[in-house]
Amino acid sequence: MHRENYFSKIAFCLLGVLFLSCITSVQTVSGDAASHEERMNNYRKRVGRLFMEQKAAQPDAVKLPSGLVFQRIARGSGKRAPAIDDKCEVHYTGRLRDGTVFDSSRERGKPTTFRPNEVIKGWTEALQLMREGDRWRLFIPYDLAYGVTGGGGMIPPYSPLEFDVELISIKDGGKGRTAEEVDEILRKAEEDREDM
């Protein structure tokens, strides 16, 4: 009888040790996964920062205080920029930093209509500085794009994005800044670049 109790206690202790070792293994594996994800995100941040620095260093690039970088491809003749709630008709192509196209109204063959307050922060800022007919190449840091979560399955976390954006029209003419006000803001941003 004592012998059965003795072996039962030993078996119970061995099961306990086995159980604890399994829990420790699971914690180590999940810790490794979290550590891997953290390393990947740190890598994405570094690469994204370098991408933005390279784009900002190009001779025709303008960097705004927010970190948004743009290049003018074509200058329009519109008299105003859109206000945050003006409906805008645009053509665009969106790319990841490696050049992969993730969305394009041009490929669909039809412009898109939306308000500046309905899109990512980088677009919101840029559109309010564009006039009808302007076409810009935008380089948007991750914090003005889809942030730490990424977007739509195609855009990883911490991804800077590149967009080729053409503002075709502003419905009802626009209520935003005048062309002169926009030119003054952009002139100041260009002067700040030259001072660096």
From Swiss-Prot:
Cell compartments where the protein resides: Secreted, Extracellular space
Highest taxon above the source species: Eukaryota
Gene3D superfamilies in the record: 3.10.50.40
EC code(s) of this entry: 5.2.1.8
Matches recorded under InterPro entries: PPIase_dom_sf, PPIase_FKBP_dom
Similarity comment: family membership: Belongs to the FKBP-type PPIase family.
GO molecular-function terms, A-Z: peptidyl-prolyl cis-trans isomerase activity
Sorted UniProt keywords: Isomerase, Rotamase, Secreted, Signal, Virulence
GO cellular component: extracellular region
Location of the PPIase FKBP-type domain: 85-171
Native source organism of the sequence: Trypanosoma cruzi
Xref: Pfam families: FKBP_C
Function per UniProt: Essential virulence factor associated with macrophage infectivity. Exhibits PPIase activity.
Signal peptide: 1-29
Protein name: Macrophage infectivity potentiator
Keyword Ligase included in the entry's annotation: no
Catalytic reaction annotation: [protein]-peptidylproline (omega=180) = [protein]-peptidylproline (omega=0)
